[in-house]
């Protein structure tokens, strides 16, 4: 739902207020009829004292609460009456105060124009210093008053909405009170409380009605106060600067006098040493003069930075007040845009830290030299002894005078250096405060502007005002055009333009040579002996250089147009540099996908895919150019983004083109390109979905009025696209380098094998006992393993780099999310060490919780693949261990993610543990078997008596363990059927694990031979059959035994061992077949029970054998 915000005319506002007030008064008739006199505070306090003497009970507590509430309401009435009287007084004196403020403003403007420092020059330095201190105090008072005036002015901007809300709330409250007063059963004390409450509401209604009625007058009054204080602040700052300049000039004059005095003394001296000392004093005086000038410069910088700091502090207060008063309105958006433009930039003075360190060292050294001059006799004696000179009394006196002057000059120098040090430290701290406050203001403005509507929603009203808005924008664009008025720099600019054309032409002249070099590289990469890892980087560099000529020509033409046809060429020049950079990138990018370009020759893609990508990129360039130049339209009007209807139309058209034309083509290209690379399918899916949904979402934002938000996101998406393109190019270049290295390694190994084979052939032709043939050495690592390990290592850094790049691109919007902390969803009490506090759960907490749940879901779904790539593929683990680790980590991630998400929403473990305890007890009785199976599953995962892949037998069911779940274990029996067995059966029942600690099992083959057979031969044949089977272990070795005399057989057993359970069936089959073959070859009969059937004739006694005739 879109709510239109508009300013209600004062007439209708006052009419609405009068109606609300009349309604509230009419509904208060019952209260007026009940009594005409309200109780006094003294009478209520007396009643309260009498009530406290009553016996304890509910009636006493209720009566005390009613009386105390009545007393509080009376006090609120008194406070409200004072507020009403103050408002009335302000209104009655508003006209005179406005005239007075305007007159004072005119006087201050005249004072500002005619300000002079002549009078200050005649004052002493102490007097000027005291005046400066007083002015600084006055400046602080003016800043505080200005803050108050600004708060009043900002609050007046939203007085209509706040007064209407208060009147509406009072009407509802009045209706509720009147309904209570209509009930005759309420007590007299409660009735008096309601009557007092009605009186308070009446005063509040009167106050709000007065505010609405005199809204314009109060706005004029507060604006005049603000203008006066603001101008007064400027005058005071100007006076401070003027006085500080006079102080600096006096300091400078004093230093100059000392220099002149030293120079005068030099003219009358004949002694060489004294002349040298005079020269040193003159140099010291000159140095003192330089340091005084530096101190004066630092003073001006410190004063300027302090004024900026005060201005920023005032701006911060103003922004906070405006945000509080105009939350969610279009007016706030326009104010934010204005404040952004007013923020200072590039104000910091560089090198202050080094200057402070140098000053401290310098002060220390000069102080040491000055301390030597306190004992002049000792200093002169030292000079006489070192230089071998003897001063006369007059010369000694003159030297003392010089040293005394030097000591004074040194003290002045130290004072100046200390002043510089203090100013530099103060300036550095001020700069730090300016940076912090500026960053805070910038962050707050970014937060507000991102989440606040910047334009009117696109609806029917927007369509109606579209023609007029378009005309205004086109007129604004025409105002930007014009011929230059100053041609002083024209010769230099022409030389600059000519230089760009010449460089571009030189590159264009070598175009054929560059193409020949590229063709040469393309031919070399198809041969193993000429291919190199540097072939692709060199080809990329040549391609970028080849596309540079058109970029330079484009830049030259754009800057010429900006100079000759725009009133402010600098704005157009900034745009031309930016567009030239994009031009170079996209011409380079599109040249990679030529039929014989790098994408085909170096990255081994098909020409059809290259052509498809080229077509998509050409269309993307159109969209990017349209979106990048949207800001041009917003700069031609005074309102900026607020009235940028042309930019809105342009942006929506570009996004529609992206969603309707580019997205389907891009998806088709990705589907055709996907078979060429079998990695990162999930990333391709995300890109495909994003290309469809992002333009639609941005269009919705623009339609709803969040035009600035959409432009901000568009800019970040474009930068992300460019960053991804560069990353993709680097990634494929590195991959190709690894491929080239792998091919060379394979070639070297093949050559080594051939050489080794040739040596072996030579050895075979040499018959000598001294020659020992050495077999081929085993390869340490397969080529595929080398390449896969390199790719995994590179992927780790490449994907980390991509995440870092994306964070850099989107980092400025991270602070925007903190705005969600101000949107409270619910509140709850929390007990801490400091006591019970109220904790607010905001929309930011909900967003963080959703992110945690999403990350947890992604980890749980992909933990098996991640562990396989990072750990399991590099470490040899026993059977079932990877499954156990994966399952346990899944449970851990779910528990941590769930607990973290709940804690983010204010539901900590201390609050949930009792719920979980109660649920555990309740569910433990109701779902005992399920809990038993759950605990049994945890035991099985930790003790690991069975593992995935083990062959087990339980309850006469045999099969292979396929899954170990929370409740049950899935077995795959030998008929390929899934058997679900509860976990509890494996813990409490008897289980046979055929491969728990050792997969070796024994096979027993029973054979019965006929009586009379050669038993030794039978034993040999059984062992021979066992030895011939490769799956039978030699340790323990096979054994054959003659066990029993059967009814018709001599029973033997062949006992062998196999390494794996899966070899049992195949080994049994092979042994039985081989034993049958060997016994048949050696005429050994396998005895069996034989039944002969005879048909007997009872009459004749003849017996006829029954023979089965096979047909």
UniProtKB/Swiss-Prot annotation:
Subcellular location(s) of the protein: Cell membrane
Database matches in Pfam families: MS_channel_1st (PF21088), MS_channel_2nd (PF00924), MS_channel_3rd (PF21082), MscS_porin (PF12795), MscS_TM (PF12794)
Protein name (Swiss-Prot/TrEMBL): Uncharacterized MscS family protein HI_0195.1
Main location: membrane
Keywords: Cell membrane, Membrane, Signal, Transmembrane, Transmembrane helix
Signal peptide positions on this chain: 1-31
Family matches, as NCBIfam families: PRK11281.1
Gene Ontology molecular-function annotations: mechanosensitive monoatomic ion channel activity
GO biological process: intracellular water homeostasis
Topology versus the membrane: Multi-pass membrane protein
Membrane-traversing stretches: 490-510, 538-558, 572-592, 620-640, 644-664, 694-714, 797-817, 840-860, 885-905, 922-942, 1003-1023
Disulfide bonds: none
Family: Belongs to the MscS (TC 1.A.23) family.
Cellular compartments per GO CC: plasma membrane
């Amino acid at each position: 739902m879109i709510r239109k915000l508009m300013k209600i005319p004062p007439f209708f506002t006052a009419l609405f207020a009068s109606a609300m007030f009349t309604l509230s008064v009419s509904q208060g008739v019952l209260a007026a009829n009940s009594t005409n006199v309200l109780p006094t505070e003294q009478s209520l306090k007396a009643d309260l004292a009498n009530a406290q003497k009553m016996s304890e009970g509910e009636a006493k507590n209720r009566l005390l609460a009613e009386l105390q509430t009545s007393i509080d309401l009376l006090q609120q009435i008194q406070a409200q009456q004072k507020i009403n009287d103050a408002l009335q007084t302000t209104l009655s004196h508003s006209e005179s105060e406005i005239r007075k403020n305007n007159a004072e403003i005119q006087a201050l403007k005249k004072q500002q124009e005619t300000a002079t420092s002549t009078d200050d020059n005649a004052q002493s330095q102490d007097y000027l210093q005291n005046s400066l201190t007083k002015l600084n105090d006055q400046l602080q008072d003016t800043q505080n008053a200005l803050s108050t005036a600004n708060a009043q002015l900002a609050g007046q901007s939203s007085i209509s909405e706040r007064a209407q809300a208060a009147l509406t709330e009072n009407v509802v409250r009045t209706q509720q009170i009147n309904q209570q007063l209509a009930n005759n059963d309420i007590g007299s004390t409660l009735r008096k409380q309601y009557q007092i409450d009605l009186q308070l509401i009446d005063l509040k209604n009167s106050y709000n009605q007065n505010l609405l009625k005199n809204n314009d007058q109060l706005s004029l009054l507060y604006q005049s106060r603000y203008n006066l204080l603001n101008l007064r602040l400027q005058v005071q700052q100007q006076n401070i600067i003027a006085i500080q300049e006079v102080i600096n000039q006096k300091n400078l004059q004093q230093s100059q006098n000392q220099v002149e005095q030293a120079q005068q003394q030099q003219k009358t001296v004949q002694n060489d040493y004294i002349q040298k000392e005079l020269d040193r004093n003159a140099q010291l005086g000159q140095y003192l003069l330089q340091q005084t000038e530096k101190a004066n410069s630092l003073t001006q910088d410190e004063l300027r930075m302090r004024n900026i700091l005060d201005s920023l502090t005032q701006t911060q207060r103003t922004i906070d007040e405006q945000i509080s008063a105009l939350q969610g309105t279009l007016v706030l958006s326009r104010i934010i845009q204005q404040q952004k433009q007013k923020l200072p930039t590039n104000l910091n003075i560089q090198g202050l830290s080094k200057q402070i360190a140098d000053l401290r060292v310098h002060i220390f050294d000069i102080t040491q030299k000055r301390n030597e001059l306190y004992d002049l006799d000792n200093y002169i004696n030292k000079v006489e002894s070192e230089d071998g000179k003897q001063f006369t009394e007059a010369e000694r006196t003159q030297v003392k005078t010089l040293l005394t002057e030097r000591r004074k000059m040194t003290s002045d120098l130290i004072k100046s250096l200390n002043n510089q040090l203090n100013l530099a430290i103060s300036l550095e701290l001020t700069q730090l405060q300016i940076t912090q406050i500026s960053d805070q203001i910038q962050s707050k403005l970014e937060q507000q502007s991102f989440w606040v509507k910047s334009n009117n929603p696109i609806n029917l009203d927007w369509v109606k005002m579209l023609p007029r808005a378009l005309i205004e924008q086109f007129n604004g664009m025409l105002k930007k055009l014009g011929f230059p008025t100053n041609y002083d720099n024209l010769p230099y600019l022409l030389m600059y333009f000519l230089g760009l054309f010449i460089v571009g032409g030189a590159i264009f002249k070598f175009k054929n040579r560059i193409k020949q070099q590229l063709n040469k590289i393309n031919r070399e990469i198809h041969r193993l002996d000429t291919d190199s890892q540097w072939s692709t980087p060199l080809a990329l560099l040549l391609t970028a250089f080849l596309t540079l000529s058109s970029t330079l020509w484009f830049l030259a033409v754009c800057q010429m147009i900006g100079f000759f046809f725009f009133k402010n060429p600098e704005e157009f020049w900034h745009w031309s540099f930016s567009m030239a950079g994009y031009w170079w990138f996209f011409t380079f990018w599109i040249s990679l996908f030529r039929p014989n370009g790098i994408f085909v020759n170096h990255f081994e893609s098909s020409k059809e895919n290259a052509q498809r990508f080229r077509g998509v990129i050409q269309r993307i360039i159109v969209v990017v150019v349209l979106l990048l130049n949207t800001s041009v339209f917003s700069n031609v009007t005074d309102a900026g983004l607020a009235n940028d209807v042309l930019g809105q139309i342009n942006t929506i058209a570009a996004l529609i083109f992206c969603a309707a034309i580019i997205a389907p083509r891009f998806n088709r290209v990705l589907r055709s390109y996907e078979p060429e690379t079998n990695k990162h399918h999930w990333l391709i899916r995300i890109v495909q979905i994003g290309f469809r949904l992002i333009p639609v979402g941005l269009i919705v934002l623009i339609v709803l009025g969040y035009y600035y938000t959409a432009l901000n996101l568009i800019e970040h998406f474009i930068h992300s696209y460019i960053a991804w393109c560069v990353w993709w190019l680097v990634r494929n270049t590195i991959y190709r380098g690894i491929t080239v290295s792998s091919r060379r390694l394979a070639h070297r190994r093949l050559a080594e094998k051939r050489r080794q084979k040739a040596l072996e052939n030579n050895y075979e032709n040499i018959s000598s006992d001294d020659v020992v043939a050495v077999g081929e050495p085993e390869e340490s690592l397969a080529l595929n393993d080398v390449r896969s390990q390199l790719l995994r290592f590179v992927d780790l850094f490449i994907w980390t780099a991509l995440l870092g790049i994306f964070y850099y691109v989107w980092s400025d919007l991270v602070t925007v999310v903190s705005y969600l902390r101000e949107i409270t969803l619910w509140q709850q009490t929390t007990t801490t060490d400091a006591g019970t506090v109220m904790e607010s759960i905001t929309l930011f907490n909900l967003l963080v919780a959703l992110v945690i749940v999403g990350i947890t879901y992604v980890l749980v779904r992909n933990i098996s693949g991640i562990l396989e790539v990072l750990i399991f593929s590099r470490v040899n683990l026993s059977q079932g261990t990877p499954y156990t680790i994966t399952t346990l980590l899944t449970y851990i991630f779910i528990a941590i993610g769930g607990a973290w998400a709940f804690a983010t929403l204010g539901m900590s473990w201390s609050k949930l543990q009792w719920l979980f305890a109660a649920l555990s007890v309740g569910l433990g009785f109701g779902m005992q078997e399920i809990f038993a199976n759950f605990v049994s599953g945890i035991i099985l995962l930790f003790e690991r008596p069975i593992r995935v892949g083990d062959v087990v037998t339980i309850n006469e069911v045999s099969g292979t363990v396929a899954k170990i779940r929370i409740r049950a274990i899935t077995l795959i029996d030998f008929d390929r059927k899934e058997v679900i067995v509860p976990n509890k059966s494996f813990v409490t029942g008897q289980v046979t694990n055929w491969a728990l600690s050792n997969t070796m099992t024994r096979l027993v083959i029973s054979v019965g031979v006929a009586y009379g057979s050669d038993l030794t031969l039978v034993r040999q044949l059984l062992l021979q059959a066992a030895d011939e089977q490769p799956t039978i272990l030699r340790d323990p070795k096979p054994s054959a035994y003659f066990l029993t005399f059967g009814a018709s057989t001599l029973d033997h057993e062949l006992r062998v061992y196999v390494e794996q359970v899966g070899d049992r069936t195949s080994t049994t089959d092979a042994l039985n077949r081989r034993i049958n073959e060997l016994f048949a070859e050696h005429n050994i009969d396998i005895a069996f029970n034989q039944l002969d059937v005879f048909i007997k004739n009872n009459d004749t006694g003849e017996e006829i054998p029954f023979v089965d005739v096979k047909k």
